[in-house]
Amino acid sequence: MTDDQTRRSAGASRRRFGARRKVCAFCADKIRVVDYKDVKRLQRCMSERGKILPRRRTGVCARHQRSLTVAIKRARHMALLPFVAAHMHS
């Protein structure tokens, strides 16, 4: 076997067992606009420290990621979500 064949076969086996593509949770539930009052749904897209998780981590599409960011910032401003985690500022 040559080096090219081993590289190709190793790459193919890695791709075959790769992680599945995540489906946007908002598109699956047919939600057009992300509501800032839906705190439970917003918290799923935030880290334990209160940061907004990136798309590659949550699997949200680009359109919903933009509206999710606005909704989280709006919920923070309305004091529905914390800016920082509770254990961080104590």
UniProtKB/Swiss-Prot annotation:
One of its GO terms (biological process) is translation. Pfam families: Ribosomal_S18. The keyword rRNA-binding applies. GO terms for molecular function: small ribosomal subunit rRNA binding; structural constituent of ribosome. Keywords: Ribonucleoprotein, Ribosomal protein, RNA-binding, rRNA-binding. Gene3D superfamilies: Ribosomal protein S18. InterPro entries: Ribosomal_bS18, Ribosomal_bS18_sf. One of its GO terms (cellular component) is cytosolic small ribosomal subunit. Belongs to the bacterial ribosomal protein bS18 family. Part of the 30S ribosomal subunit. Forms a tight heterodimer with protein bS6. Binds as a heterodimer with protein bS6 to the central domain of the 16S rRNA, where it helps stabilize the platform of the 30S subunit. This is Small ribosomal subunit protein bS18A. It comes from Roseiflexus castenholzii (strain DSM 13941 / HLO8). The lineage of its organism: Bacteria, Bacillati, Chloroflexota, Chloroflexia, Chloroflexales.
